[in-house]
């Protein structure tokens, strides 16, 4: 075995569906300053208030989608890891989670102890956000520095418009799109508008523009989450030949009362159901592995909401998971990181 590891990093999951484990996970997640970017005292107070009721609610949601093998997100990421082994001849392939287990700092320390000296760190997020990519990269850097680990790292950059990534999306979704349907909704994870505003030095971010950041500087395009989501959706629709009007974009998983980027997925589900859409396909291209946000929020609650609004059928298109084309594409992108 050589000394160059591939480390696939995803968001994470509670250890179980118990309220205690969910509370512990939510506390770690929400106290990350890249997730709730407020001063520590305010963040601590807000998270403490959230943790009064949210753990029990979330535990019920996790229980509704939990597999015999464990958390779908963790299980699917491990399946991806297993598939990647034959595509990475340079050393071990490991997974880590930003929150929960296996913890990123512990995995880095274990790799160093095994004699690994180079790590290709692959945050499994197609689009850039401080609350996903930056927090992973900064924690890795902090861990290596504080624990004095003899590791060199290279980072897989966001790949939201990489032609091979779009090809992988197309390959995984094609069986669903070849069936009859009325509309395709591409639902991305949402973000508070302030997360984008603080990265835009111009102060002129247009959150309603259909071509968000299209003509902005390369530096701005590299950090504009909304613009990258729109670019992913447009590239995918063009790849699949989906006409304008038959697809749209929305943003899900809003937390709290702050203004988040729009349109909200729950609003679009109502609008589409009331507009006469009967069979709705939903893809979630911000996630590469199915998780509570796809399986429960869209596949269960979203389906119920759409039907109540007048729709007849909502079909959740699976994420990339361990699709062979995605495995091939990810291996190639990591090789060239």
Curated annotation (Swiss-Prot):
Catalytic activity: heme b + 2 H(+) = protoporphyrin IX + Fe(2+)
Gene3D superfamilies from the UniProt entry: 3.40.50.1400
Enzyme class of the recorded protein, top EC level: lyase
UniProt KW keywords: Cytoplasm, Heme biosynthesis, Iron, Lyase, Metal-binding, Porphyrin biosynthesis
Pfam families in UniProt: Ferrochelatase
GO terms (BP aspect): heme biosynthetic process
Protein name: Ferrochelatase
Lineage, highest ranks first: Bacteria, Pseudomonadati, Pseudomonadota, Gammaproteobacteria, Pseudomonadales
